[in-house]
């Protein structure tokens, strides 16, 4: 509770992604799998369970989990590539501090996704080999 906030007021999480049109789970991935603030897996699961029934199509738990993990792979893969590009091509290493969190999120999502769909096993194996520190190899 913030000082001066009205009694009973609760803090809320909001996501300001701009005008990007994406599946509703994408916003959850952006908020819950942020590279700058690493949430515990249990906290992520609790938020997902609370929001899932309120999504436009109210997907069943398995459909939601599949979408969430595939979107996590897409989003975190993009983040990881941007961090490495900034460091290697522009000499801007500020974002490398967030690569370990991003790689951990990629590895968890890839492992879960490959259990659901064997066609993702090779991708999961490649992601599993990513070093948390981009300078490790």
Name the predicted role of every residue range.
Residues 2-8:
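Activation-loop N-terminal segment of eukaryotic-like protein kinases
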Residues 8-10, 25:
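A structure-centric signal for secondary-structure junctions around beta-strands
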Residues 12-15:
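Pre-DFG segment of protein kinase catalytic domains
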Residues 21-58, 70-90, 102-109:
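Active-site activation/catalytic loop segments of kinase-like enzymes and analogous catalytic loops
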Residues 60-72, 97:
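All-alpha amphipathic helical-bundle segments outside canonical DNA-binding/catalytic cores
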Residues 81-137:
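ATP/Mg2+ or Mg2+-diphosphate-binding catalytic cores
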């Amino acid at each position: 509770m913030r000082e001066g906030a009205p009694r009973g007021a609760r803090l809320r999480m909001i996501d300001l992604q701009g005008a990007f049109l994406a599946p509703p789970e994408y916003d959850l991935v952006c908020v819950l799998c942020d590279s700058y603030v690493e949430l515990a897996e249990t906290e992520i699961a609790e938020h997902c369970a609370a929001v899932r029934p309120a999504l436009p199509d109210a997907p069943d738990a398995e459909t939601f989990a599949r979408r969430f993990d595939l979107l996590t792979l897409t989003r975190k893969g993009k983040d990881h590539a941007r961090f490495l590009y900034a460091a290697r091509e522009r000499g801007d290493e500020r974002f490398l501090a967030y690569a370990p969190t991003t790689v951990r999120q990629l590895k968890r999502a890839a492992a879960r996704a490959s259990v659901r769909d064997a066609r993702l096993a090779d991708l999961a194996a490649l992601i599993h080999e990513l070093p948390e520190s981009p300078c490790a190899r």
